[in-house]
Amino acid sequence: MRRSNVVPVHSLTSSTNTGRDSRGEKYDELTPVATRRASISPDEARYLTQLASRDNAVSRVSTVADISLDDPALNPENKDFDLYKWLRKVVHVLNEEGVPRKEASIFFQHLRVSGTGAALQLQKTVADIITAPFRRETWNFRNKTSKTILHDFNGMLHSGELLIVLGRPGSGCSTFLKTLSGELHGLNVDEKTVLHYSGIPQSTMIKEFKGEVVYNQEVDKHFPHLTVGQTLEFAAAVRTPSKRLGGMSRNEYAQMMTKVVMAVFGLSHTYNTKVGNDTVRGVPGGERKRVSIAEMALAGAPLAAWDNSTRGLDSATALKFVESLRLAADLNSSAHAVAIYQASQAIYDLFDKAVVLYEGRQIYFGPASKAKAFFERQGWFCPPRQTTGDFLTSVTNPIERQARPGMESQVPRTAAEFEAYWLESEEYKELQREMAAFQGETSSQGNEKLLEFQQRKRLAQASHTRPKSPYLLSIPMQIKLNTKRAYQRVWNERTSTMTTFIGNTILALIVGSVFYGTPTATAGFYAKGATLFYAVLLNALTAMTEINSLYSQRPIVEKHASFAFYHPATEAIAGVVSDIPVKFLMAIAFNIILYFLSGLRREPSQFFIYFLITFIIMFVMSAVFRTMAAITRTVSQAMTLAGVLILMLVIYTGFVVPVNYMHPWFKWIHYLNPIFYAFEILIANEFHGREFTCSQFIPVYPNLPGDSFVCSSRGAVAGRRTVSGDAYIEASYSYSYSHVWRNFGILIAFLIGFMVIYFVATELNSATTSSAEVLVFRRGHEPAHLKNGHEPGADEEAGAGKTVVSSSAEENKQDQGITSIPPQQDIFTWRDVVYDIEIKGEPRRLLDHVSGWVKPGTLTALMGVSGAGKTTLLDVLAHRTTMGVITGDMFVNGKPLDSSFQRKTGYVQQQDLHLETATVRESLRFSAMLRQPASVSKEEKYAYVEEVIKMLNMEDFAEAVVGVPGEGLNVEQRKLLTIGVELAAKPKLLLFLDEPTSGLDSQSSWAICNFLRKLADAGQAILCTIHQPSAILFEQFDQLLFLARGGKTVYFGPIGENSQTLLKYFESHGPRRCGDQENPAEYMLEVVNAGTNPRGENWFDLWKASKEAAGVQAEIDRIHESKRGEAESKDSTNPKDREHEEFAMPFFKQLPIVTVRVFQQYWRLPMYIAAKMMLGICAGLFIGFSFFKADTSLQGMQNVIFSVFMLCAIFSSLVQQIIPLFITQRALYEVRERPSKTYSWKAFMIANIIVEIPYQILMGILVFGCYYYAVNGVQSSDRQGLVLLFCIQFFIYASTFADFVIAALPDAETAGAIVTLQFSMALTFNGVMQTPEALPGFWIFMYRVSPFTYWVGGMAATQLHGRAVKCSAAETAIFNPPSGLTCQEYMADYMAVAPGHLSNPNATSSCEFCSLSVADQYLASVNIYWSERWRNFGIFWAYVVFDIAVAVMLYYCFRVKKWNFSFGKRKKSKAA
């Protein structure tokens, strides 16, 4: 469809005649639908259907009243469904019901927007942490540097208009759209700015009508496990108006709108398919983009901003999308501002207005049809066949723009000069007159528009909704819909839920069996306490995993809040509600098994109290961790807080350190600890009202009379053979049963309090801030033009700060670099390539007998509709697939591919994956060092890297750090680096490129394709996928391979001059002729998208039967014959070298290079290293001062052991800090570096293991200093040295254990679950919580296998050996000896065989007996001996070595050989 075929709405309103449409039906004076019917495709009509169904009217239609509502043509699910009739019927009904039209305009004057940031940033390193206190900027507490992003914009957009926003990446397009739509988080609008919507100030609009102005982000954000149908039905439901068509219910309306909008965007077949994301399999990327568009369309906003929403869509689909917006604006009076980086002429012609941005300055705003003439008058030349959009963008590119002859000295050069020219132009003056008139009109209307908006909103709002609320639904209705969606997510993710359920069951079985058979006597006191401690702790701490899940969904909730779908707090409430049954199941699985297996109190009331408290504490701690996620900005902040909190909660529960032994500086923590109150309830519930038989008396003599004996347990009374449970818990924990229901009330108060904080924080902290883009440089390597404070672009003509590959001003320099590319002679061919995979047990063919070749010196384009298999074919040809079955032939010079094929090819992936901490030059050097042959010297490789930098014109940012988008290279610079990394490798065979122009503006796309053309002319063989080529860009290619859906070849062969060869082939099979000014690429996509030619013949079948297809096969045969002879003669003359080896460099040279890079990366991750060190220091200090100066009592001795135990408790946090970084490294290696055969997997694994060790050693030293002296004071030097060695060893083990766990696993979540399980088992079986003698016989092997058994034993023996024990009053057993005997005489026989000592041996009453004399006596009872300390030290090293060996083995088996976790080998792809 072309803009010229569309009759403007205003032209229809001037006539009062009645005519007939193409169907012979009458239409009246206001029927734009009928007028446009001939040019509306079915998909477009469906989009109109959706829009017309909203609470507005297109026009007054009275001639369709006689169509029955039961007519099949009005049923979207009926095969006879007639969208045209349905649309007219809907419009008629809406008009009869008096639903008002949604109209709004945008007016902005002197719009100036700033953000935080500076021209450049310096990369932070570990050295910066050390030197920070000595640098001046550290102590500068003033506000962050403000950077102006948009300078003085003026304009207005009326209802029914489309505005195209043009500018290069970084020019401010996204900021402009965000500002118009009120997405101002992190942005500051100047107070002099005037910005209103039909007279309504922006502040009022955002507060009361947020859903009327919406912004579509460039990135797709959805709940991945929801289906497309569920996602869109939810969007329809939350924006369902109160007044609906034909008395439909809310559910009926939402379902109808969902079905219609899915048909509009071609998504009907995906109704039950998960949306998916980068890690969850779902719909393809192009369809996911359409889901985003459909979701925002269902918002029904009259004002919409679309930020590069055509990214990832082919040109035909992109055109249809913009045509839909055009029709929506005309028929529904909506207004749309659209930023498009690659706009075809057909797309551009659909817009009413255009705005051009140049480095944040407005250099044109006005009619789109006059923009080209404006810049030509300014003095710029528009080349033939260049689209208007490309031309307008090109004038902002100093390298690409061309002045008209004679105008070179008169045209503006800098952004400020362009802006000055615009402000002096007649077009600007005309705009000012229009704006003045509009301002006068809106001023005269007063509050009419505001009242109109409010009235329209009230008609749409549900009852009980606050009038000033921007939402259509009441809070209870929002909670209901969010809860329904939450349950859908739980059900769709049931595999994860079941995994957690099974894990909890296994953990309960393990812990329960460890304490199985605990006696109901005093010997079981400690075990019962430990059981309940585990019960409350494991129930409480499972909620920590919710932090990650909340952060993963936060961007989605933010987006929905911006659409005015619901309050973020209502989603938080729904999440808690949906958790109730899940947590209930988890509680049943864990608590019932643990309770009865461990032999806790078998009474109904006690069991139900136990279950109630453990269930409540799950929700209390869930609220605590959710609150942490809500009040923080990053997941690392939340996890750091959680790690410290867990330590505090565990130590101050009252079990590890009883209340009476808590030091005053930290004692307050237990009052704020919910687990403390829960633990007291469980202990009191278990022990209250019970008398426990004494297991051991002091002394153990037969027939003891009166009070001459006492039970060895705390709370015992002399002369009694039982011990009161209440007395025991009072003496041991200072607990009382009277506190049970008080504590329950406190837990409920904690639950309510934290839930309220969580809901409020979620509502208030639900927006991500924006900041200005900035380059990051290494300290001391800043470019001079930025170091001196100048903004990039101050000298555009010199290319300062510019990143485009030169094609004119820098051409000579670039050509000199390209000539250094070695000439190529090899030809890559493939024949009848077929690729089959299984999806849900069903076979699916992705490639169907594809044949072709790539010759040196040729540039071949690979094109096709979305989902045709372009990237799949590249992956198959490059041998990068890891599943499915491949058949067919692939040859180089007629010979089968060898192991060196992948390293001899370059593969530029669509995703720009690079090491964030490296600079551009370092990234290129790393590629050159490892991928160029070992025979080439380091100096030569580095020299070639400099040539690549010149070729790609990257000198200005060669020392810039890759970073992340916003703080680092921009999209264009990243793409250039991706290409540069492959060029630095000097690929000998060919270069694959997958969508190298995706996300780039037209000028950057042209520059990159022009550069590829030059590479091809220099002898490089190139195969490149591309989906939105302009006519000029398309002409750069020599050959085309075009695929239809299903990977079926439609054409392979030369494109020809002006695409004549290609067009001749297609036109010979019946479709319409391609117009002279039409883009051949768009013509071809349109023709093939139809599926068949006008005669009904399938394009794939036509190709197979064509003489061109036969010619392809004959040419492949000819290539094979001619090249085989050449290859044989070469092989006979060339000596053997590494030519056919898998890697260019041998392993012993790879390892140092990779290790240095990883060391460099760690040095440049100060936040990671600081977080690691702070965790160690804080944990060490906290543990040290919690067990400060452990005294000589029994509890003091236990405190030392528990301090060692608590050091073990930070193990899980340490490991989970390391795992995400390893995954980041592994993702880069496995996605880009390993497929390119850059270096061996062995070098990757060993380097990552080595680099962690120095930091772990430093951490061990710091923790030793913080912990050891606080607990033990100064002991002998040999003990200090050994404890230091144990600390260092512990942290080294943590890093190797992390590598061991994550080596084979796919993600951090799975690894985290396994770490938690293994860590829990290691702690359970290390002999502290349950002595070896008390363990059931089955589990004694776990005591011996647990690494912490040896570490805790070594640490405890070293610290406690030889320490005298002096019992405290509570620990002393007091009894009276028989008359006439002293305590010493009475106890002599007993003390001859039992440990312990008397405090008053000569007393004749109240004997005070301490059950131990020295700590070694207790240590021996738990199988810890001073003599075995060095043995334990050596055994723990064996675990370190074991972890390293198994990590390497697991990586090889599961990540290299691709075994699955069913212990079978995955079916590998194979080429016949």
Curated annotation (Swiss-Prot):
It holds the Pfam family ABC_tran. One of its GO terms (cellular component) is plasma membrane. It is found in: Cell membrane. One of its GO terms (molecular function) is ABC-type transporter activity. Disruption phenotype: Exhibits enhanced susceptibility to itraconazole, however voriconazole susceptibility is less affected. Induction: Expression is increased in clinical azole-resistant isolates. Keywords: ATP-binding, Cell membrane, Glycoprotein, Membrane, Nucleotide-binding, Repeat, Transmembrane, Transmembrane helix, Transport. SMART domains: AAA (SM00382). It comes from the Eukaryota. PANTHER family: ATP-BINDING CASSETTE TRANSPORTER (PTHR19241). This is ABC multidrug transporter atrI. It comes from Aspergillus fumigatus (strain ATCC MYA-4609 / CBS 101355 / FGSC A1100 / Af293) (Neosartorya fumigata).
